[in-house]
Amino acid sequence: MRSSFRLKPICFYLMGVTLYHYSYAEDAGRAGSEAQIQVLEDVHVKAKRVPKDKKVFTDARAVSTRQDIFKSSENLDNIVRSIPGAFTQQDKSSGIVSLNIRGDSGFGRVNTMVDGITQTFYSTSTDAGRAGGSSQFGASVDSNFIAGLDVVKGSFSGSAGINSLAGSANLRTLGVDDVVQGNNTYGLLLKGLTGTNSTKGNAMAAIGARKWLESGASVGVLYGHSRRSVAQNYRVGGGGQHIGNFGAEYLERRKQRYFVQEGALKFNSDSGKWERDLQRQQWKYKPYKNYNNQELQKYIEEHDKSWRENLAPQYDITPIDPSSLKQQSAGNLFKLEYDGVFNKYTAQFRDLNTKIGSRKIINRNYQFNYGLSLNPYTNLNLTAAYNSGRQKYPKGSKFTGWGLLKDFETYNNAKILDLNNTATFRLPRETELQTTLGFNYFHNEYGKNRFPEELGLFFDGPDQDNGLYSYLGRFKGDKGLLPQKSTIVQPAGSQYFNTFYFDAALKKDIYRLNYSTNTVGYRFGGEYTGYYGSDDEFKRAFGENSPTYKKHCNRSCGIYEPVLKKYGKKRANNHSVSISADFGDYFMPFASYSRTHRMPNIQEMYFSQIGDSGVHTALKPERANTWQFGFNTYKKGLLKQDDTLGLKLVGYRSRIDNYIHNVYGKWWDLNGDIPSWVSSTGLAYTIQHRNFKDKVHKHGFELELNYDYGRFFTNLSYAYQKSTQPTNFSDASESPNNASKEDQLKQGYGLSRVSALPRDYGRLEVGTRWLGNKLTLGGAMRYFGKSIRATAEERYIDGTNGGNTSNFRQLGKRSIKQTETLARQPLIFDFYAAYEPKKNLIFRAEVKNLFDRRYIDPLDAGNDAATQRYYSSFDPKDKDEDVTCNADKTLCNGKYGGTSKSVLTNFARGRTFLMTMSYKF
């Protein structure tokens, strides 16, 4: 209640200012020519006239921008990865784009926005039991509608700094100006793309109209429609093998070995059939010796069934199932814009409907922006937005190998209201002060249409009765022994952010001082399942007269597993300050310091494998202290009158306290009450999100350079980073179909993936223009240095060493996942030719991965997936392999009678030819 009282005075003040000045504007308009005209003295202002795509080289922050993305043939992942310090969490099954800044990703670590509106969608993919599934935050937006991307690293201002730990990224969608040229009344924008190597069709059309009014204002309207198809059974580099068939030959050789060694069979290549190997002793003894053809056929079929059900999954190293990753999407964009003398507003609707395999993703976005600009002291901006996301899973969809018994639907709804005013003051001694005061209300909600009890860890059904864990005797039991409900898929809950923010920019001569601050009040509530072994235990927890007890009380059953809610609140203050100077075109230095926070998410606080064992609402907010130093260079006329040079170099150091990750260990207060079902079953360990005890340190530098001579141009980006950020226990898991019963308790459900950036990475582009700039020829080189991925092996933390203990008062062990280093990838070269026979009609042909190199994309979800291991005993001297294996012997520890061996088959796309056409008229 206290925050609402604070809000009222500011809201009334801003509303009063708005109404007063709006009335003033109307009166001034009616006065017309009667108004007196005041003649001001001439004011001479010298300022750099910098093109939009070059402004980053004069901005005293660690910022990057990319323009005209809708014209590009590059996918959004590659565009983001061309920005130093920025990356993406690539996932073929997510249907979204998930941005990474300096090794941090996800809601709150990176404030990913579309047209200034924070994106909160949480994508969760299904899995038949091989890879383990995946989940991640991101933006559901069609790149055909994106006009530009702005990335801010390590600092903040305005509403972009709300719940933003590492920085922000804003995807700007098309506006009327992008479609209607100059003073034209109508405009049309077309784009189409096709190609080889499983590149499907991609097309977009947008139409716009603008009408100029007598007052000088304009009204514009825009509608766009986009469709695309995505196929994933591409050919990898270095041989042309399809990714979906990778490892098939190896699997076939393993099958033959099994038939020969265990079945005493041999393959007759002439008949194409298996037959008895009469040289083997087995066929000399009864009953085998008297087998007729029918009995032999049955014998072969039994071996084939045993291979398919028990052994083939252990040797299957196919990285993906392309048939389950076929993607089709259709999107719409509608905008209505009014641009007046004093007032501006934009109303927009955007949707994207995506189907990936059997899963449907439906996103709807509504937004209204209003601006009132009257004088230097009144520049009022109002933004209201509503985002809705749905994921629909049909009956039979599987999560970590366990199927849904009924249709299942999850949803995410977000409401945002932002109000701010900017004032500019002319101070003595040629000093200028600009301030912005604002308030932001943000409500974010996650929910589902039902509680899927069939996904519970100990649920007993047909899908649970398979795999190695079932063969060895899995953990199971009725309500009298174990909680039956789990919150592993889409935890439900709500978040409320109430934020006051203030920006100030002081400018004098060549110096500039910027300061931004905000205070965030955070309230949350989420669902979890309780477990009470008796009526008395339930009564003691809530009281006999409580609504909860009355709602769930059932004296006949004696065991209670109610779905309950738990609430909490937190608060944080954030600051960002920077100082810069403009000593000339060649040297514009800047330095900044920021303290930022990230609030725990619903998924971190309410995920739970068993009952409420994973619930942890006492998580502390993450806190980052970031120092940055850098300089800009922007010079026009370096070697000739109209060439331009842009350079930005930034070094940074960051320390993060209370880093949130999930660990495997005991979750209860060791000095408090021990859960009754723990003491009776001995199942003392589970996955829970916790604050990392050590501080996380990051440091690195980022370079961005652009030189344009006219005939010749080049772009260079390069980033280097070292980080001590820990992994999550859920970053890698055993394959569900091959897990032992112990490993079934350690399934990570695809909750997370490694997010640490490659040690270094970069991109160099060189091009030249001919035929009066109608023909552009160019090429780009992509470089990825050493990177890491998670393995299934455990790393013990918090002073533990892996020793188990039956004493429930002792910590025992806490573990996350080990990592292994992926070597520097080969250089990847792309080539393109663009021809513009008439203005704004562009044909572009290009070759991706020109030399057909075989390489791995860093931070691809498939790198950490369970498909990148095979699960069986093996002979280390065995050379019958066609996969790249890790030589680290610590990964082959023979646990549970077998070995988890690491492989590398998740290769990126090989040589691909693309053709793009875009036309604007």
Swiss-Prot record:
Query: Which ranges form a coiled coil?
Result: none
Motif (TonB C-terminal box) on chain: 904-921
Q: Where is the TBDR beta-barrel domain?
A: 185-921
Biological process (GO) annotations?
Answer: siderophore transmembrane transport
Task: Quote the subcellular location field of this record.
Answer: Cell outer membrane
Tell me if Signal is a UniProt keyword of this record. yes
Superkingdom of origin:
Bacteria
Q: Which residues cross the membrane?
A: none
* Signal peptide start and end residues: 1-25
Q: Which UniProt keywords apply?
A: Cell outer membrane, Membrane, Receptor, Signal, TonB box, Transmembrane, Transmembrane beta strand, Transport
TBDR plug domain location, by residue? Answer: 53-174
Major location (coarse): membrane
- PANTHER family recorded: TONB-DEPENDENT OUTER MEMBRANE RECEPTOR (PTHR30069), TONB-DEPENDENT RECEPTOR HI_1217-RELATED (PTHR30069:SF50)
Record's function text: Probable receptor, TonB-dependent.
- What's this protein's family per the entry? Belongs to the TonB-dependent receptor family.
| Protein name stated in the entry | Probable TonB-dependent receptor NMB1497
Q: Which organism is it from?
A: Neisseria meningitidis serogroup B (strain ATCC BAA-335 / MC58)
Lineage of source species: Bacteria, Pseudomonadati, Pseudomonadota, Betaproteobacteria, Neisseriales
